Amino acid sequence: MSMEAPRRGRRWVSLGMIALLAAIGLGLYWDQLSTPSGITPATSPRRAEGLLLGRLPLPMEPSLLSPLERLLEPPLRYKLMTIRHIPPVKPGTGMPHPYVGDCIQCHLMVGGPAAGSQFKTPYGAVLENLSRVRKLGPPILPTSRQPHPPAGRCIKCHDIVVKVPVDKKGGMRWQL
């Protein structure tokens, strides 16, 4: 009898160790089940949507939460504003509008090159001269691509159209 008592104790210890290892393995497996498809707490909503739907939405495409965001935050109302004249600016002054590109693409610089000194092709020079009577080009956005050879500053032939908020409480910010 004295020989069987230690064996019975070893059996319980070995069964306890096996049960403990099984519980640890089941816990690790359960942890993997609780995060489906690799979604972790650090996953962005865009990546989570891609994992769930099988593709990533485009940057300008509305997300799954966009309808809710639109309900909570009323959209800003904008009106169109046509710019027919662009004033010269001093180098180093603040920008009164969002960044569109290099200042010299639209503005003349005070103390800089004179008007008409921008590079233009002979065809562009003819277009610029014809636009002195009446602007030949259609209204364009500040971010529009140039569909013709260089012809000096865009404002000479085109009116520039921007969207300006109707409610100016937050300051005058363009929407391009």
UniProtKB/Swiss-Prot annotation:
CC cofactor note:
Probably binds 2 heme groups via the 2 magnetochrome (MCR) motifs.
Q: Which UniProt keywords apply?
A: Biomineralization, Heme, Iron, Magnetosome, Membrane, Metal-binding, Oxidoreductase, Transmembrane, Transmembrane helix
Q: Name one GO cellular component term.
A: magnetosome membrane
> What cofactor is needed?
heme
Q: What happens when the gene is disrupted?
A: Cells have a weak magnetic response and make magnetosome membranes. Magnetosomes are about half the size of wild-type, but nearly as numerous. Deletion of this gene with amb1002 to amb1007 give smaller, elongated magnetite crystals, does not alter subcellular localization of MamC, MamF, MamI or MmsF. Deletion of genes mamH to mamV (amb0961 to amb0978) gives cells with no magnetosomes and no magnetic response.
The record ties this protein, via Gene3D superfamilies, to:
2.30.42.60
Work out whether the entry's keyword set contains NAD: no
Tell me the InterPro entries matching this sequence: MCR, Multihaem_cyt_sf
Q: Where is this motif: MCR 2?
A: 140-160
Q: How does it sit in the membrane?
A: Single-pass membrane protein
Sequence intervals crossing the membrane: 12-30
Inducing stimuli: Part of the probable 18 gene mamAB operon.
Q: What else is known?
A: This bacteria makes up to 20 cubo-octahedral magnetosomes of about 45 nm in diameter which contain membrane-bound crystals of magnetite (Fe(3)O(4)). Expression of just the minimal mamAB gene cluster (amb0961 to amb0978), including this gene, is sufficient to form a minimal magnetosome chain with small magnetite particles.
Protein name, per record: Magnetosome protein MamT
